Amino acid sequence: MKHEEETCLSIFVSLSFLLGACSDQPTETTAPKEEKANDAKETTGTKENEAKEVGTHTAQWSYDEHTGPEHWGELDPANSACVNGSEQSPINIEFSQVKTDKKLEGIHIQYQPTTFSLVNNGHTVQVNPTTESSNIVVEGNGYKLVQFHFHTQSEHQFNSQNYDMELHLVHKDANGKLTVLGVMIQERRENEKLASVWDVLPKEETEKDISVKEPVDLQALLPQDQTSFQYNGSLTTPPCTEEVKWVIFKRPIEMSKVQIQAFQEISPDNHRPVQSLKEREMIRN
């Protein structure tokens, strides 16, 4: 009898040890999996936050009160030039302050009738060439047309007066330097050269480019009298990058009231106020 009790006790102890070992094993293997899962969640969360943060920075600025021009420099450290820059654009061009005693090389504009696509980027309507056939030469350096867009009212002023709109034709050279041609727009007759662009103006922000059905002849769009003012400035939108060469034509082009209103329905006011000229020179060609 005593031998049977000892045998049962021995079996019970052995079973207990085996059950204990089995119950401990999942605990040891599960913990690392949970830690890895938590690590993965933390990593994913960080990447999602970074993506949201970057997206917010790129879409944060506007022309409205709280994220408008007065606050651009506060929205992102990359926009510091908007408040600290020494050569900011646009400017007021006082004709009496323009230097006429300096000789500048002529601007050679070599635009070809080109097909374009356009996009409403939330800040303006931007028109992009589908070829690289249009370019300019400024002071012996070649620049290719990369896009053109519009502002209302005009960003630059002549003798403290704004025009109804302003056209910016943006060009880039082989080193990434920019030259922008600025053309004032006044309300008068319909501009047939831009009719094909105005026919497809997107009223809301677009994700994909919209094709312009007919080629646009930008050479014929420019004023015949190409007297211009030149100065060194910046982008007129964040990040307000400087070292941009500006060429502002003195003579405006025309658009009808209907055409101007069609753009203003999309962008009621997308102009940056004029900035201080400081020590810069304005030169007339």
Task: Describe each region flagged by the PLM.
Residues 15-16, 75:
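Residue-level signal for mature regions of secreted extracellular proteins and peptides
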